[in-house]
Amino acid sequence: MEKEFDDMLQERLTEAKQIEKAKITNFLEEVWKNYRKSKKEDFIQSPQTGYNKKELTRLAKKINYLPEGKKYFRKILKLFDDRLAMLESDKLDWAMGELLAYATLLQDGFSVRISGQDVERGTFSHRHAVVKTEDDEEEVIPLKLISDSQGKFDIYNSFLSEYAVLGFDYGYAFNTPNGLIIWEAQFGDFFNGAQ
């Protein structure tokens, strides 16, 4: 059996040596075909980046709505109520701004993928993109509940293995030109280690 395997390897090596020119196929060509390199002229005028306030308010209510009939932790209910109260005061905090940015991208059909050690909750408990019910730990992800036609939203708490996770997301980003792919360092020296 070992000899058969060695013979097969030798045969393949002999075949490979007979090929004079290797053909390299760009496997990402198809997903990037609608894009081109930027030109100097592209930066003369800034693109429109604003979002309609009425639509932002609708999205804010949507991403801060927790489906009824489930038992949530009081702390989570207060957080979501406080977020809705922010809308009335016309003052948003960083977390709400971040969630709204994701919501607008998703609403416009772009995908968003976030990974990192503590991204579902947010390192300092600011995000709570994933909420777990108190009684059975069912996961509720409001950013997945915006509309039937929204972009795909994925969020993953990863292992404390920066090289592997960042490497995976770097490759994932190459294959997802219409998506926002984020690897989030928790805090401290994790970012430097991954670099």
What name fits each language-model region?
Residues M1-Q195:
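Flexible, glycine-rich loop/tail regions that form catalytic "lids" or insertion modules at the edges
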